[in-house]
Curated annotation (Swiss-Prot):
Gene assigned in the entry: treA
The protein's name in its UniProt record: Periplasmic trehalase
Active-site annotation: 319 (proton donor/acceptor), 503 (proton donor/acceptor)
One cellular component term from this protein's GO annotations in UniProt: periplasmic space
Residues involved in substrate binding: 159, 166-167, 203, 212-214, 284-286, 317, 518
Top-rank taxon: Bacteria
Keyword Transmembrane helix appears in the UniProt entry: no
Length: 570
C-alpha cells in the first residue's frame, strides 16, 4: 500500500491538466510521453508536469546555478493555485520571477559543511561520516518531489540529498564493514518497499526519477544482507527480486528476433539481452536547460530522441561517457538506447543466479532450475555477442550497426565480477585493463578524454571495486593489487590535503579529485567511503587492520573473494 502522502488527487491532476491545456501545447514535445495522470492515480508527477510552463520558465531563466535546486523545491500551496497566480502576474509590469519563486516555494537548504575533528585517520573520518550522511523521510511535504521511505538511509553527499540506487550498494559495503548491519537492513527494506510501490527501484527517491531505474544491484544488496542474516534474507526478498526481474524483462514474451521493447532486446539469433531505457523523452527536470541546449545543438535529430538517450544514460549511471556517443566530443550524438551494455547484462546474470539461489532457499527447486537456465542462456549470449574477439575484451553491442563495439571501458570487468567470464578471456581482460586503463591513481573509466565525467582521466570508486574483486575472482591478484593500491593511495593523498573523500578522482596522478560533467565535484561521499573501507581490508591483514593507507605497498592482497565461481571459470 502506497502511503497517502505520496498520492496525488485525481481531481487535482485533472484540474491541472485542464487549467494548463492551452499553455502546455507550447511544450507538447516536453510532456507528450509523460504518464497520463488519469491512467495511474498512484504515480506522483514530476515538477515539470505539475508546474508546466512555470517550471520551464524558471529553469530557462537560470535563477539558480544548479538546475536541481528548483526541481527539489517544494510548492507552498496547491500547484494549480500557484500556476493561476503565475498566469495572472507574469505579464504585469515589474513582475519579478525570482521573488515569485521565493514566495511560493521552499527551496532546498544547503547542507551544513561538515568539519571533521582534527587528526582523524581515514577510517575514523569515514566512520564519523555515517551519521552525517544519514537521512529519514518517512513523511514529506505535500507536493514535494521527494518520495518518502519507511526506514532511514545514507545519501551520497553534496547536491545529492536523496538515496540513489546503485550508489547505495557500495555505500552498504562500508556500512557492513563498520558493523552497521541495522542500516544495511534498513536500506534493503527501503528498496524492497520501492519495488512494491513502483514496480522497480527508481534512479533515486524523487518523482522525476520514477521513469527510470539504475544498474540493478538489488540482488547484490540482498546477498550482502544474507551474509549477516543467512538464507532468511533471500527468502524474505524473493518476491521483490522477482518483481525487479519482471521490470527489466517486461515485453520479452512478445519480441521477435531483431526487436526491442523498453529495456529488453532480442537479437537476430534469438539471444535475449537488455539495455538502459527511460520511459520519458523530455528534458530531465534536474538538468532541464542543459538537455534543451544539447538537443538544439544537433537539429538533424529529433529532440525527443536525444532526450531519451540522455535520460537512458542517466539510468546507466554513466552520465555521461564517450561510451554512449558516436562523437566523443559532441554529447548530442548520444545513442544509449541503441547500445547493449556489457555491465548491465552481467548484473542481470547475477540477478538470475540470485533468484535461483533464493528460490532454492524457499524450497522451490523447479523455479530455481528455471532461473539457472535463464542465467546460463544469458551467459552464452554475453560470450557470443559481448566479447570482442579482435581486441580481446568484453564490450558493448551496437544495435544500430549490428556489431560489437571496439571501445575498451571499465565495464569490461563486470563479467569477471559476477563470475560469468571464461577463464582465458578473463586473463585477456586483465592484460587489457593493465595496459590501457591502469593509471598512477587507479583504473580509468575509459581511455578517451571527452570532457565527460565518465571518461578519462576520471576513476570512480565502484568501478575500482568491481575491477579489484573481479580480477581476484580469476586469480589475477597482481593486477587487482595494482588497482587497489593505486586508488587507495589517490584517496589517501586527497584526504591528507583536503580532509574529505570525493565522488570521483583524477587517476592520471594521485591526490586530485576528478572533473568534467554537469556539476562541480561533490564530497561526502557514500560509495567512495564504502569502497575505501573494503579496500583497506584487502591490503591489511585481518589480524592487523589499518586505519589509513600504509606508506609501503603490501606484497599481496590479504583477502580473497567469498563468491563461488560459476562453471565458466573452471
Amino acid at each position: 500500500m502506497i502511503p497517502p502522502e505520496i498520492r496525488r488527487s485525481v481531481l487535482l491532476q485533472k484540474a491541472i491538466k485542464l487549467a494548463l491545456a492551452g499553455t502546455l501545447l507550447t511544450f507538447a514535445s516536453f510532456s507528450a510521453t509523460a504518464a497520463d495522470p488519469s491512467s495511474d492515480t498512484e504515480t506522483p508527477q514530476p515538477p515539470d508536469i505539475l508546474l508546466g510552463p512555470l517550471f520551464n520558465d524558471v529553469q530557462n531563466a537560470k535563477l539558480f546555478p544548479d538546475q536541481k535546486t528548483f526541481a527539489d523545491a517544494i510548492p507552498n500551496s496547491d500547484p494549480l493555485m500557484i500556476l493561476a497566480d503565475y498566469r495572472m502576474q507574469r505579464n504585469q509590469s515589474g513582475f519579478d520571477l525570482r521573488h515569485f519563486v521565493d514566495v511560493n516555494f521552499t527551496l532546498p537548504k544547503a547542507g551544513e559543511k561538515y568539519v571533521p575533528p582534527a587528526g582523524q585517520s581515514l577510517r575514523e573520518h569515514i566512520d564519523g561520516l555515517w551519521p552525517v550522511l544519514t537521512r529519514s523521510t518517512k513523511n514529506v511535504e505535500k507536493w514535494d518531489s521527494l518520495l518518502p521511505l519507511p526506514e532511514s538511509y545514507v545519501v551520497p553527499g553534496g547536491r545529492f540529498r536523496e538515496i540513489y540506487y546503485w550508489d547505495s550498494y557500495f555505500t552498504m559495503l562500508g556500512l557492513a564493514e563498520s558493523e552497521h548491519w541495522d542500516k544495511v537492513a534498513d536500506m534493503v527494506a527501503n528498496f524492497g518497499y520501492e519495488i512494491d510501490a513502483w514496480g522497480h527501484i527508481p534512479n533515486g527517491n524523487r518523482t522525476y526519477y520514477l521513469s527510470r531505474s539504475q544498474p540493478p544491484f538489488f540482488a547484490f544488496m540482498v546477498e550482502l544482507l544474507a551474509q549477516h542474516e543467512g538464507d532468511d534474507a533471500l527468502k524474505e526478498y524473493l518476491p521483490q527480486l522477482q518483481k525487479e526481474y519482471a521490470y527489466w524483462m517486461e515485453g520479452v514474451e512478445t519480441l521477435q528476433p531483431g526487436q526491442q521493447n523498453q529495456r529488453v532486446v532480442k537479437l537476430e539469433d534469438g539471444s535475449v539481452l537488455n539495455r538502459y531505457w527511460d520511459d520519458r523523452d523530455t528534458p530531465r527536470p534536474e538538468s532541464w536547460v542543459e538537455d534543451i541546449a544539447t538537443a538544439k545543438s544537433n537539429p538533424n535529430r529529433p529532440a525527443t530522441e536525444i532526450y531519451r538517450d540522455l535520460r537512458s544514460a542517466a539510468a546507466s549511471g554513466w552520465d555521461f561517457s564517450s561510451r554512449w556517443m558516436d562523437n566523443p566530443q559532441q554529447l548530442s550524438t548520444i545513442r544509449t538506447t541503441t547500445i547493449v551494455p556489457v555491465d548491465l547484462n552481467a548484473l542481470l546474470y547475477q540477478l538470475e543466479k540470485t533468484l535461483a539461489r533464493a528460490s532454492a532457499a524457499a524450497g522451490d527447486r523447479a523455479e530455481a532450475s528455471q532461473y539457472d537456465a535463464l542465467a546460463n542462456a544469458r551467459q552464452k549470449a554475453i560470450e557470443m555477442h559481448l566479447w570482442n574477439n579482435k581486441e580481446g575484451w568484453y564490450a558493448d553491442y551496437d544495435l544500430k550497426n549490428n556489431k560489437i563495439r571496439d571501445q575498451l571501458t571499465a565495464a569490461a570487468l563486470f563479467p569477471l565480477y559476477v563470475n560469468a567470464a571464461a577463464k582465458d578471456r578473463a586473463a585477456k581482460v586483465a592484460a587489457a585493463a593493465q595496459a590501457h586503463l591502469l593509471q598512477p591513481g587507479g583504473l580509468a573509466t575509459t581511455s578517451v578524454k571527452s570532457g565527460q565525467q565518465w571518461d578519462a582521466p576520471n576513476g570512480w570508486a565502484p568501478l575500482q571495486w568491481v575491477a579489484a574483486e573481479g580480477l581476484q575472482n580469476y586469480g589475477q591478484d597482481d593486477v587487482a593489487m595494482e588497482v587497489t593500491w593505486r586508488f587507495l593511495t589517490n584517496v589517501q593523498h586527497t584526504y591528507d590535503r583536503e580532509k574529505k573523500l570525493v565522488e570521483k578522482y583524477d587517476v592520471s596522478s594521485t591526490g586530485t579529485g576528478g572533473g568534467g560533467g554537469e556539476y562541480p565535484l561533490q564530497d561526502g561521499f557514500g560509495w567512495t567511503n564504502g569502497v575505501t573501507l573494503k579496500m583497506l581490508d584487502l591490503i591489511c591483514p585481518q589480524e592487523k587492520p589499518c586505519d589509513s593507507v600504509p606508506s609501503t605497498r603490501p606484497a599481496s592482497l590479504s583477502a580473497t573473494p567469498t563468491k563461488t565461481p560459476s562453471a565458466a571459470t573452471q
